Curated annotation (Swiss-Prot):
Keyword Oxidoreductase listed: yes
Family, per entry: Belongs to the iron/ascorbate-dependent oxidoreductase family.
Requisite cofactors: Fe(2+)
Organism: Phoma sp
Applications: Eupenifeldin is a bistropolone-humulene meroterpenoid first discovered as an antitumor and anti-leukemia agent. This metabolite also shows anthelmintic activity against the parasitic worm Hemonchus contortus, anti-malarial activity as well as antifungal activity.
The protein's name in its UniProt record: 2-oxoglutarate-dependent dioxygenase eupC
Metabolic or biological pathway: Secondary metabolite biosynthesis; terpenoid biosynthesis
Length: 313
């Protein structure tokens, strides 16, 4: 049985040198090396020194709380089953997702927002592509504009992260510094507002969200200060490492993760869903981005997975 390792800690990386026009080349290279090392060792790191204003981070969490404070019937008015086609926008109540056989469904509830694609677009209604659903109760609070403003900030931040990751790839792979740019072509960028309510019945099979790997390329997680629960599995010691919450920090995820009331906002870069992603190391492995993500959803999502399974048969 794996246990929590309170001695180890995932790295914290300050990327301010990447954003400063006066930073030395050595300082920039240190950030690149540190990020590359963190991805190899953990697949996770804390990120600080970014240019996201503290008030924007607080506002994202405030929007999270505004939505989940709505009565259940008002949240269900923007239920994910009302989204167009297979766009999967809107509210998911607790009990939708099960990550492993033998576990109970996750207790989390989510509100999903993505890239805004209107009904006239030829791709509207295809997988993870379509218009967002917005609760009318929060219109006067500027909810939609506030959420989309935060999403735009996350897209700019993930571009900075991708550029840094590209510069950290092995020189023998002969990759350019813009090798990840195709991911940002009409990208799938689901952003999930998450609420983990208190677990009233204690059961070893019950989690807010069980251990899993994220489906896409890069995830940016904003956690509420003063909370805990997220852990990273560290294979060398076969132990779970707690992820601390930094007041002005984000958790960046490339790999495995395991997640009182707790709120968080997760931004996922899945990339261009039509892109044929090829392994950069020359191994020949390749996959269509959208097909890979759909298969993972079928494996773990109840209502959403069943819908995808029917449409793919």
């Amino acid at each position: 049985m794996e246990i929590a390792n309170t001695q180890a800690a995932i790295p914290t990386i300050d990327i301010s040198a990447l954003l400063s026009p006066t930073a030395s080349e050595q300082s920039r290279q240190t950030v690149i090396n540190n990020m590359s090392d963190a991805c190899h060792a953990y697949g996770f790191f804390n990120l600080v020194g970014h240019d996201i204003p503290p008030e924007a981070m607080r506002d994202a969490l405030d929007c999270n709380k505004l939505f989940f404070a709505l009565p259940q019937d008002r949240k269900m008015e923007v239920s994910i089953d009302k989204s167009i086609g297979r766009s999967f926008r809107g509210y998911e109540p607790p009990g939708i997702q099960t990550h492993h056989e033998g576990l109970l469904p996750d207790t989390k509830e989510t509100f999903m927002v993505g890239r805004e694609v209107m009904e006239g677009d030829p791709d509207c209604g295809s997988f993870s592509t379509g218009p967002n659903l917005w609760p009318s109760d929060l219109h006067k609070k500027g909810f939609q504009d506030r959420v989309m403003s935060y999403q735009a900030r996350m897209l700019r931040l993930v571009e900075t992260i991708l550029d840094c990751l590209a510069l950290g790839l092995p020189k023998s792979w002969n990759c350019t510094s813009h090798v990840f740019k195709p991911l940002l072509n009409k990208p799938s960028i689901p952003m999930r507002f998450l609420h983990y309510g208190p677990v009233e019945i204690h059961d070893d099979r019950q989690f807010g969200v069980a251990d899993h790997t994220d489906f896409g390329f890069v995830s940016i997680l904003l956690q509420e200060a003063g909370t805990s629960g997220l852990e990273v599995f560290y294979p060398p010691t076969k132990s779970w490492v707690p992820v601390p919450v930094f007041e002005q920090g984000f958790v960046i995820n490339m790999g495995d993760m395991m997640q009182k009331h707790r709120h968080s906002v997760a931004f996922f870069l899945n990339g261009d869903l039509k892109l044929n992603a090829k392994a950069l190391d020359g191994s020949g492995h390749e996959t269509i981005v959208g097909e890979q993500i759909q298969q993972r959803l079928i494996e773990t999502m109840g209502m959403t997975g069943n819908l995808l399974r029917r449409e793919l048969v």
